[in-house]
Structure formats: C-alpha cells, structure tokens
C-alpha cells in the first residue's frame, strides 16, 4: 500500500485505490493533498502489534507540532465494502499503557490525525477497534460521514468464561474498554459529522476538550485549543455509554456545537442490554485540573433526540446558552440527569 501511495505522489495523480484484503503491522502515513480510496477493501491490524492503521504524514514529528508542519487536504474514502478492522485485541489498555515497555494507549486508534487542515473520512466500516476508532487532535475544516461501527462485545466473567453481549451491571467483565467511535479532541473546529451507525462499546461520538497527556503530546504551538464550530447530525447507534458526548475541563473551551438527530438504537442491539445516555454534556468527575466555567462551555444546541438508556440527557457542571428541543424518551428512560452547577 505504501508503494501505491508513493507512486501516486510521484506521478502527481495524488490518488490511490486499493482493494482486497490487507494485514497492517505499522501505521500508513497519508501525505497532504492526497486521496486514498478503499474499494471493497478489508484492512485488518496484525495480531500482537501496537500501532495505528493510518496517521497523517507529519504526525508524531517535531514539525508536526508546529503551524509549519500542518498537513492539508487528506481524504480517506470507502467504496463498496470498505472496512478498517482492529482484529484480535492486543491487550493494551488505559490501565497498563506506557508501562513495562508498552506504548501509549493512542497507538490503538485505527486512525489518528493530528494537525490537519482539510480532511474527509467517509463511507467506511470500523470493526473491533482496540480503543477509540477515529481520533482527531488539532484537526480543522473536516468531514466525517457515513461511518458504521461494530466494537468487540466480548466479556469474560470472574471464572474465566467468555461470553458476548455487554451488561451494565457487569462492566468489569468487558474485554475491550473505552472503545469509542469518533473522538474530536482539543484544537478541532469547523467539522461536520453525520450519518453514524452501528455499535460502540463506549461513546459513539465524543467531543472531548481536555488537556491530558494525549493533548499535550500533540498540541500545536500557536494554535487555539478551543473545540468549536462542530455540527453532528443523524447519529443512530447503540452505545454502551453515550451516543453523543461533550466534555471540557482544565482551561480548554468547548463552544458553538450543534447536535441535530440522535436516535438511541440500544434496544435493537444484540451487543448491549442498554446504554447510559443519548446525549451527555459535562461530567461530575474531574479529568483535569478543574471543571469548566460557563464562559468555557457555551452556545450548544441539542435537538431531535430520542433516548432509551438510563437517561436521555445528562448535564453536569457549568454552561450557558444551551438550547434543547425535540427531546424524547422511550422504553421508560428518564428524561434528564441534571448535575448542573449554574
């Protein structure tokens, strides 16, 4: 695959098409002004490796943490049956990563873009992600659409018995934890996310503006850390945690977000008993140095939501200019878990 990419750059077509079955054992770097088309292609992570499947060209480099190292106009497009498959779980988790010779947990993202201006990821199925499937940090002017997920639903009980189908009261049994679908982190803005389906072990779409080790590693000098100007439309997923989650803490702003159309499909999924929330904004738990203020979480619109988990909505912390409309509950779900402080 790397040779196809290199050849398309040399001949200046800057578009490569791959088909068939591929085993990936190290990250494929996508250059600027480039389109990779996966046409009836099944890309599977090799057993036992600790690696992303795709990263942008300057990801993880010194210049990649500067405005001069911004990669631009990268497209990953599926045609027909295009699949990114995490394969067999490699055991790397949030509890054991970065210890005893293990790499950081973000090596388990199927796709990790950092400092990219102009991108499109669409018409792809993601299966068996080993952590978050699609992760974006300091990425702007992008489109993520027509993505279908199916996380690993394996659980192992206290006696070592393996079973499938996740249950809220047996979270400790879950093999692959925090297997989100799409994550936008700090510095992301002007992005449309739409038409998201399938099953995720944790959040299906998460806009999480924190300032942890991940964000500090890939922060871009001189650029704003705000997570803003994002629209999320038509999310129809079964999420063991939350269909759409928003969270910011520790001086990072989250604002000007529109969520329009979230339908909790948990009651129709064989993978979970039910989820927690359809939409969740904020958290009572502290992830950073402090909770956000209302001047850091603002201008958020949530409309046309139907939830059937524990609650339809969860609101926590401080926020202002929050607009809610068209919120419905099904299957006896409670409407609102309200832990707001303002």
Feature annotation, model-predicted:
Residues 1-342:
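Extracellular/periplasmic carbohydrate-active domains that bind, remodel
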